[in-house]
């Protein structure tokens, strides 16, 4: 998987995400003294990390020089392992990325094609992956099972240190030339390959394209680790082998363990793999950015880029530009405190309605959205600060530097100089409060989060223990801020952004209407050139080579050589979370009494099925408005935003569909309030819920209309970007919307229908201006507010006993206050959900829909209806989906067809089956594969081992660790209590091969209705008249 950095969000969590977690334990420092020798390693450093309640142990392998970091966390059962390598890409062929894929295609100890994927069926891991960064590659997994941990570590270590790296794996995962029909030598030759198609998909995302080209320009020595599709086809098999030999050596390895399992056992296993390697002197080759190799003060680069055909803007208004300052080298240990200060400052300048760059560049209408590279970034040896915008005219691009400096000099510097009454003081307190909350908040993926935060700098020579010791830097900052106030930030700006001699890099992407077509044309020219150089013998050899590859992809593998867990490793009884049912004002309160480290988690929920269905599509906009419009009657949004961050860990307002676990044709539309806070600030959650829900300003003032205009534009852009990243989910939403009422509503509020609706809002806003908002949208938002205030809430609390008791009193007051603020409204039940349920058509015939969007690769879905959560059939279908995926579809969709991913998923709660492909060069072909596979379960010769593997895969998610705040949540939100969860667990465990054949026949074969959706470019796909083509109108 390519690890990318696209800043789609400017949330405050960006400042604190690497710090967010805590585990209440007291590590033992005496366990691993410095100098202790363990299995060829020597302990070089042992240090407490009190902010995370960990002990960090750093070790060095004496013979090879390999380093290991262990984070001892005796009370966390979710153990993590990783091995990372420094992998500077030598060019733009994507060799680190392709190697990441091919190492996992079989090894000396496990000579099975794709052991990585096959281990997902033999494990209870809750996380398994491999990731390629700018100049590093790492292979992490997490599991709560000690036997599983040992098995997976063995597979990972064998994969990276003794991979087979067969030529056929290179062809499959990297790139190859192949006949369009692999069995027809006369058919057209084309480029294929998993990574090749993945990167074609990435390049379809304009935000990714802008960012990766920016990085290539500002950091030319680093090269593109993911690979440029034009260059991927230049990589040779020999080049792959050479890159592995050079980089995948113990001297270049960083291994990591986290959790409660014995360090000694891990080191013993790792050191055995190191024995076969000769000692090798290794030095860290840190590539330098353009600022280090060219001492110029100003750099200016312009490149051509794609036009976004979905946002309704003229080509001349689609320039993207950014200005970046060089802040120094983040690998310098003396820079760590400056980096922390820059994180705080970056949040002040960019995050939220209070931030000056947001106010002056987005709200003012100068641009629509920040560019993907905006903000503070640490990439290898470059710490940079960037201000960038999307959707500008050429004139605004030319004036952009002047505009940014005007904001800095006329707004930011004066505010930083206003020590006595600056609004920045409150915002800084809010940021520090979020960090404090982060230390206390429990997250089940804590270990992996720490790993992700240290790897990029660790492979470049930074001590990871220093990176983890946040408390020292935080204490330093608090003291510095107490003594010097805002001056510390003013001085940062004066030394860098305001310094006329600071190195500055301007990067612009100029829109070209023919850009996407040119990419396709270039690909065709590349393949034509390659083909023109082939002799008939060459073509025959390619044909035979690919026939052999296709044959290999279909061959059964001897998976007996792989380690595995068994059904006996799955606990027969699942976790039960004791829930007390309290009562406040005759309203039920679900109470989960558990240690939450001083935090309270609160929810309020009500049934709003009476809401007229015509208002459903406006719910996401309404929810967004509550915390992003102009604020409330008493609190402007700038103050409200700071108040939320200073007093709580966050509050949200959302709507959700809850399907009856016993009947997929019955559901409720619910409205949910959520909040989290420190115990001593609990009352703030309820005060803010009340104020926001009852007094948010939905009037036609200029301020409200301006905010609403910006919000709608931002929603549109975010949704468009999401399609390229999650196209298979959107395709599935379209297919499933014809199957059940819950999926129909889901498409309206979060699927392609919602995207289309927001695009229509933007189109009308563009043509009619803010008068349209005042006349059409504001009255609807006011109407929804009235509806949401109808009905009664019920409540949920998670915390210790003292917190629960205190919050019951707070809920009692909130409930009385919210009830007294209920407006008079006549509810017409016939307009609501019941009318939709009564009229829903369950008898859709098969149909094929192409959603015509300009993507180089496509996404496909074939949907069918299933059964309820509580039914035995539902459990069998969940297991069936795993067998279809790993025994049939994976090889056909990914390995043969070259899509990045594909399979069959089952939504157990909503009862829908979905065949899918992701980043697929031929999604229409995948649809035919799905059709051909419908009866596969009747003919497959599955055995008990196959059934066991499918059950293991299902239980990876069933038994995955969850947040403390989620314990018992399904009983409150979905009416699924522990006993029903246990019943479904027993249905999983009791599923037989006969059950699988029965549900195959009943739901896949006998049900002939296939709801098909493909998202892609019809100029490439050229579908026939059997397809309905759905064009997005703007």
UniProtKB/Swiss-Prot annotation:
Extent of the transit peptide: 1-26
Q: Which family does it belong to?
A: Belongs to the peptidase M16 family. PreP subfamily.
Q: What is its main location?
A: mitochondrion
Task: List, alphabetically, the InterPro entries matched.
Answer: Metalloenz_LuxS/M16, Pept_M16_N, Peptidase_M16_C, Peptidase_M16C_assoc, PreP_C
GO annotation, cellular component aspect? mitochondrial intermembrane space; mitochondrial matrix
**Entry binding sites for Zn(2+):** 97, 101, 198
Q: Is Zinc one of the keywords?
A: yes
Cofactor(s) needed, names only, are: Zn(2+)
Q: What is this protein called?
A: Presequence protease, mitochondrial
The residues responsible for catalysis, as annotated, are 100, 173
Function of the molecule: Degrades mitochondrial transit peptides after their cleavage in the intermembrane space or in the matrix, and presequence peptides; clearance of these peptides is required to keep the presequence processing machinery running. Preferentially cleaves the N-terminal side of paired basic amino acid residues. Also degrades other unstructured peptides. May function as an ATP-dependent peptidase as opposed to a metalloendopeptidase.
Enzyme's top EC category: hydrolase
Gene Ontology BP terms: mitochondrial protein processing; protein processing; proteolysis involved in protein catabolic process
Q: Which PANTHER family match?
A: PRESEQUENCE PROTEASE, PRESEQUENCE PROTEASE, MITOCHONDRIAL
* Self-association state and partner proteins as the record states: Monomer and homodimer; homodimerization is induced by binding of the substrate.
Question: Which SUPFAM superfamilies does this entry report, sorted A to Z?
Answer: LuxS/MPP-like metallohydrolase
The EC designation for this entry is: 3.4.24.-
Species this chain originates from: Candida albicans (strain SC5314 / ATCC MYA-2876)
Which keywords are on file for this protein? Answer: Hydrolase, Metal-binding, Metalloprotease, Mitochondrion, Protease, Transit peptide, Zinc
The record's free-text note on cofactor binding: Binds 1 zinc ion per subunit.
